[in-house]
Each structure stands twice: as structure tokens, then as C-alpha cells.
């Protein structure tokens, strides 16, 4: 039996009809609705692909500000954070409005996250204004200030040279030398047993010589 003799002819109309029975032609191509998928995974795929992602809702409270100038400034800034995150433009018309919104150092890092303004008070936007004005330095624009963030390296993150240099540059009391002990401990962890023993013996001998009263107490 040949391959052709085992096939059943299919008409043009049957070949191009959809499951609902409608015929597809050049005139109605694309107009006939696709059949509703029966399988759950197909339904879920079609649904999720056609729905736009929802933006995180920002809780606002600028209407609670009683001062009109301050409220306009707060509303302007919140609108930008909500509508154009990452492109914040501070164009305040008056120095009074500018003084409402000092800008923290981390503003450029957190504008893309969800913003929540809670306990909004007159002249203060939570996360945008500082409680302590002394923590801000000037940006060069009148009444707009930027937060100053200092990074502190912990003693356990320093090596011995860094600790020694730090101790040379400032007046220190005995408590501040604890960082040196942490640095020495880091050295001992990295040494082999023989070297660590020599360092420990040298330090112990110095302690016994310089602070015998403490060793013996």
C-alpha cells in the first residue's frame, strides 16, 4: 500500500475552519475570535500576557499640610516620585517652598522603590526631611540641603596598619585600643600555628613588662 492510498482527502473548508465551525477566508482573516482555551495553563498564559503590570501604590498625605506653599511643594515632589521615578526635578518658585524639602543623599537610590509617606506633618515629609537640621550640608541652592552620610569601618574590618595609623592621628583613651586587639586577632587567625605562637608570646611578654599590676590582679 502506498502512502497516498492510505490518506483521506480533506476539503479546503474543513482545513481552514476553527473549532467553532466558522470558516476562515481572505475576507475575514483575523476577524474571527480565537476559541477559548480549555486547558488551565493556556488560560493562565493568555491572561497574564495581556494584563499590564500594576504599579505599587504610593500612600500620600500631602493634603494634610495646612500651609499652602508647603503643600504645593510637597505635592509637586510626590507627583514626580510617583509619575517619573528616577527623574526628580526640584523647581521651587520661592525660597519658602524650597526649604520644605531637603534632599537626602540616598534619594537617587530609592526613588524607584515603593514610597510610603506616613505621619505627614506641616513642613515635614517622612523619608525626605531630616529631624535634625544639623545633619545636612548645603547643596549650593538656597534653602535646599543634602544629607551627609559617613561610612564607618568597624575595627574587625581593619588590618593592623590601618589601626595603627588611626591611633596615631587622634587622641585615644584605652577603650579605643580595643580595635587594635581585634586587628591582631585577625592576624593570628591567618597565621600558621608556629607564627601565631611567636606573636602571642611577644605580646604576652610586653604586657607582663608594661602592665604587671593588671596581669597579676
Curated annotation (Swiss-Prot):
Organism expressing this protein natively: Caenorhabditis elegans
Q: Where is the composition biased (Basic residues)?
A: 44-58
Q: Which keywords does this Swiss-Prot/TrEMBL entry list?
A: Nucleus
Tell me where in or outside the cell this protein is found: Nucleus
Name any Gene Ontology BP term.
positive regulation of protein localization to nucleus
User: Is Membrane there in the keyword field?
Assistant: no
Name of the protein in its database record? Adr-2-binding protein 1
Q: Where are the transmembrane segments?
A: none
**Where are the annotated segments for Disordered?**
33-65
Asked if the Swiss-Prot or TrEMBL record annotates the protein with the keyword Metal-binding, the reply is no
Oligomer status and interactors: Interacts with double-stranded RNA-specific adenosine deaminase adr-2.
Superkingdom per UniProt? Eukaryota
One of the record's GO cellular component terms: nucleus
Please give the function described in this protein's UniProt entry: Required for the A-I editing activity of the double-stranded RNA-specific adenosine deaminase adr-2 by facilitating adr-2 nuclear localization.
Q: In which tissues is it expressed?
A: Expressed in main body hypodermal cells, the hypodermal seam cells, pharynx, intestine and some neurons.
